[in-house]
């Protein structure tokens, strides 16, 4: 196993370190199937700095709904109404959360990563299409990819049940969406990705996956 090091310059005083940990529970091309853990050390020079940890399961995340594909982990299927509001803000009060326990994992000796941390760049996508949609296939969890791809985008056939937007990132990228929307409580937001358009539409499947695939996210809005 390898670890990464990040150096930051901080003023004197108290600072907040927040980590969102996701355990896949299956073997992927990135991780073996191992028991979950979090390994973090904070230090100033050679002196280790004590960290007071608190933890809470994020109940808004549905567990193991669908795998992205057999080589990767799971689709994010999240009801944001069930997440602690504002928990990612530095001022959030987590004093009521539980304290984690130390665990031992027989993983061998940790070594520093041989590559630098992956860079994260902001990319503004280009809007290439928009309109309204209507559902025509099954329930949300039956087959998320088919439900997404088979939605009717012709407003002349069915009453509109929602809106859609199609964006172009300019090239094939490893990306993660960052959206800020003012939505009513319970509104559903689905995001799908594809390397190319199929018949002018995003097809949320990954070619050559050697199995089923769902290249998408699903969120239920808290409201606001």
Question: Where are each of the predicted segments found?
Answer:
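Extracellular/oxidizing-compartment recognition motifs
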Residues: 1-224
């Amino acid at each position: 196993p390898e670890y990464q090091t990040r150096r930051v310059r901080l003023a004197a005083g108290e600072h907040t370190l927040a980590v969102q940990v996701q355990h896949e529970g299956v073997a992927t091309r990135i991780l073996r199937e191992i028991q979950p853990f979090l390994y973090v050390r904070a230090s100033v020079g050679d002196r280790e700095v004590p960290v007071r940890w608190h933890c809470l399961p994020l109940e808004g995340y549905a567990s193991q709904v669908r795998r992205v594909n057999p080589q990767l982990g799971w689709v994010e299927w999240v009801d944001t109404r069930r997440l602690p509001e504002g928990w990612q803000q530095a001022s959030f009060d987590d004093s009521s959360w539980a304290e984690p326990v130390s665990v031992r994992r027989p993983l061998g000796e940790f070594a520093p990563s041989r590559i630098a941390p992956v860079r994260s760049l902001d990319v503004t996508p280009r809007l290439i299409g928009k309109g309204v949609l209507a559902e025509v296939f099954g329930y949300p969890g039956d087959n998320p990819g088919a439900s997404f791809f088979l939605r009717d985008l012709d407003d002349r056939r069915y009453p509109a049940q929602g809106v859609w937007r199609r964006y172009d990132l300019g090239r094939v990228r490893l990306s993660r969406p960052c959206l800020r929307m003012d939505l009513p409580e319970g509104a559903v937001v689905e995001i799908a990705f594809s390397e190319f358009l199929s018949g002018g539409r995003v097809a949320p499947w990954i070619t050559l996956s050697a199995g089923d695939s769902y290249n998408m996210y699903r969120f239920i809005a808290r409201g606001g």
